[in-house]
Amino acid sequence: ETYKNIFWWLAFSKPRGVLGKKFNPVDHPEIYKAISPIYNIPDVSQRKLPPQLLTSATKDRISPVKMIKQYANALKDKNQEFEYWEHLNRNHAYLDSGKTIYAGNDFKKDGIPALKVMMNFFDKHL
């Protein structure tokens, strides 16, 4: 994370890694690799993971489509079950309630289609 992400400014906070200031990805890559899902996918012959639904928004610059597809390819390489869905012409935070002026999202227009995809996934797998 960097200061380029406006949400740090809006929260009056500073960018940090998921493990705080002491352990950052540059100085401790082995720790981040150990907890990163993409590096810890077992082959289906070793352990079958539950089906996963991966969603992305084509205008998302925080969690870009490319990153989600990398994870999808890693699951595919290990023969794990997943479904992938792209929310076309949408930005990050399309599931936020109400309207998000910064992202240009409106829950009624953007969230409902995503929830339908999620509910269909749950109906199929639960």
Please tell me what each predicted stretch does.
Residues I6, P64-V65, D96:
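Short glycine-/acidic-enriched loop or helix-start segments at secondary-structure transitions
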Residues G17, K59-R61, F107:
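A generic structural signal for short
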Residues Y39-L49, K66:
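Conserved serine/cysteine hydrolase catalytic core
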Residues R47-K48, L53-S56, D60:
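Short beta-strand/loop motif that positions the catalytic acidic residue
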Residues L53-T55, K69, N73-L126:
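C-terminal catalytic histidine-bearing segment of alpha/beta-hydrolase fold enzymes
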